[in-house]
Curated annotation (Swiss-Prot):
This is Serum amyloid A protein. The modification Pyrrolidone carboxylic acid is found at residue 19. The keyword GTP-binding does not apply. Belongs to the SAA family. The gene is SAA1. PANTHER family: SERUM AMYLOID A (PTHR23424), SERUM AMYLOID A PROTEIN (PTHR23424:SF29).
């Protein structure tokens, strides 16, 4: 009689453990996707391409699964919030005001929702990206 509850308990623990590992793995891979998009944006240094790279990083991360989508949201929100703080300290000197932040967040959400990031791709951006 005690064998069945023991097996049930172990299977539940192992099942949750497997899901947790999958989520963490997806989150790590999603964070890497976000970093790769950021690195590509810096390397490309192409005018009006930031929304594309925001959408692409979020899209790639979200394709990993729930963990990737979570990582993309956390990283995107942290980036935008840190920009707001630096804008306050620099009195808007960075050129990333509230309007730009809202547009960035819209591109982030566009990508996370699975929509094509090429919607934001500027004309002339090299095919490498």
């Amino acid at each position: 009689m005690k064998l069945f509850p023991g097996l049930l308990f172990c299977s539940l623990v192992l099942g949750v453990s497997g899901q947790w590992y999958s989520f963490v793995s997806e989150a790590a891979q999603g964070a890497w996707d976000m970093w790769r998009a950021y690195s590509d944006m810096r390397e490309a240094n192409y005018k009006n391409s930031d929304k594309y790279f925001h959408a692409r990083g979020n899209y790639d991360a979200a394709q990993r699964g729930p963990g990737g989508a979570w990582a993309a949201k956390v990283i995107s929100d942290a980036r935008e919030n840190s920009q707001r703080i630096t804008d306050l300290l620099r009195f808007g000197d960075s050129g990333h005001g509230a309007e730009d932040s809202k547009a960035d967040q819209a591109a982030n959400e566009w990508g996370r929702s699975g929509k094509d990031p090429n919607h934001f791709r500027p004309a002339g951006l090299p095919d490498k990206y």
